[in-house]
């Protein structure tokens, strides 16, 4: 789907340079099909970089996707210009009376922070409760998965002793599941997290269906049977250099990080990394948009009655 964004959003020129199909609002108004309304709650510090990553994945389908960016942290950002936030982001009270076809909640660098110490924890809880009645399908990514499991299922925060960072192999558990349709039996995806997601914990304390696991037995992709919520514990949206940027940042901070697993050629940080997960990331988001959003969302969003199988 070509994504539909405001004409002036920096991602327009950035993604067009990569030959990604981006449709400005001006052009979209001449088409007579209803775009999917997708809300992105961007919790990452470098918001422009994160916008580019997610919009790239949302752009590769035959229908329009109307993107709305949401922020819930009113504190001054050290990584994103205030002008950008004011021009392209809305606050929750501006959209709380609307319905959306899809919601994406991004990760956040909060792996070692207790939930109640997160500055915007009450706002996250508010958005997730609101989404139950106002969003057809919600996709949680990395830290947002941990937050959602706590809010929706009461699962306590699970933290690893050491951060997991690198590109890991996964395998699908249900070859005919819609969200994994077209996946290879084994595929690669990046991880960068302290959060722990043992598959047994998900099976024992939720009614969610695990669709893909890491080779070590961590849940990677899981969802509710009614398709209303889906979870991905890694970062399929990452650019080729994102893990490298995080690694060198931590080196400069004196944190002595481990070299990201299976990422730099010959395990040498001086070598340029290659993205080995792009096809997986694109297919995952295309499947979510098609099977979890487009196929069940009502045509008239004023009446939130998803067509569930």
UniProtKB/Swiss-Prot annotation:
Q: What does this protein do?
A: Transfers a succinyl group from succinyl-CoA to L-homoserine, forming succinyl-L-homoserine.
Active site: which residues? 142, 235, 237
Molecular functions per Gene Ontology: homoserine O-acetyltransferase activity; homoserine O-succinyltransferase activity
Return the EC number.
2.3.1.46
Keyword Acyltransferase (UniProt): yes
Q: Where in the cell is it found?
A: Cytoplasm
Superkingdom of this entry's organism?
Bacteria
> What GO terms fall under cellular component here?
cytoplasm
- Per its record, how is this protein called by name? Homoserine O-succinyltransferase
Top EC class of this enzyme: transferase
Report the family membership: Belongs to the MetA family.
Record-marked site positions (Important for acyl-CoA specificity) = 111
Which coarse location class applies to the principal site listed for this UniProt protein? cytoplasm
**Keywords, alphabetical:** Acyltransferase, Amino-acid biosynthesis, Cytoplasm, Methionine biosynthesis, Transferase
Check the record and name the NCBIfam families matching this protein: metA (TIGR01001)
Q: In which pathway does it act?
A: Amino-acid biosynthesis; L-methionine biosynthesis via de novo pathway; O-succinyl-L-homoserine from L-homoserine: step 1/1
Q: Where is this site: Important for substrate specificity?
A: 192
Q: Which reaction does it catalyse?
A: L-homoserine + succinyl-CoA = O-succinyl-L-homoserine + CoA
- Annotated substrate binding sites: 163, 192, 249
């Amino acid at each position: 789907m070509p994504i539909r964004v405001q004409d002036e959003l920096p991602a327009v020129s950035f993604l067009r340079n990569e030959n990604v199909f981006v449709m400005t609002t001006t052009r979209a108004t001449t088409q007579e099909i209803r775009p999917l309304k997708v809300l992105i709650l961007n919790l990452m510090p470098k918001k422009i970089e994160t916008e580019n990553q997610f919009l790239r994945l949302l752009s590769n389908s035959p229908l329009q996707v109307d993107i709305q960016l949401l922020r819930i942290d009113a504190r001054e950002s050290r990584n994103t210009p205030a002008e950008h936030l004011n021009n392209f982001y809305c606050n929750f009270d501006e959209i709380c009376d609307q319905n959306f076809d899809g919601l994406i909640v991004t990760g956040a660098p909060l792996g070692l922070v207790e939930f109640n110490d997160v500055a915007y924890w009450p706002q996250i809880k508010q958005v997730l409760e609101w989404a139950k009645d106002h969003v057809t399908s919600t996709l949680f990514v990395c830290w947002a998965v941990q937050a959602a499991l706590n809010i929706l299922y009461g699962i306590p925060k699970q933290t690893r002793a050491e951060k997991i960072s690198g590109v890991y192999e996964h395998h699908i558990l249900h070859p005919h599941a819609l969200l994994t349709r077209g996946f290879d039996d084994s595929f690669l995806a990046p991880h960068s997290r302290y959060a722990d997601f043992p598959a047994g914990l998900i099976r024992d304390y939720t009614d969610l269906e695990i669709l893909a696991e890491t080779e070590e037995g961590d849940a990677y992709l899981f969802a509710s049977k009614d398709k209303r919520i889906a979870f991905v514990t890694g970062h399929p949206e990452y650019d080729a250099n994102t893990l490298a940027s995080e690694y060198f940042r931590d080196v400069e901070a004196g944190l002595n990080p481990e070299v990201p697993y299976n990422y730099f050629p010959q395990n040498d940080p001086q070598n340029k990394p290659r993205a080995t997960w792009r096809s997986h990331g694109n297919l995952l988001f295309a499947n979510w948009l098609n099977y979890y959003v487009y196929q069940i969302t009502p045509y008239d969003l004023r009446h939130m009655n998803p067509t569930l199988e």
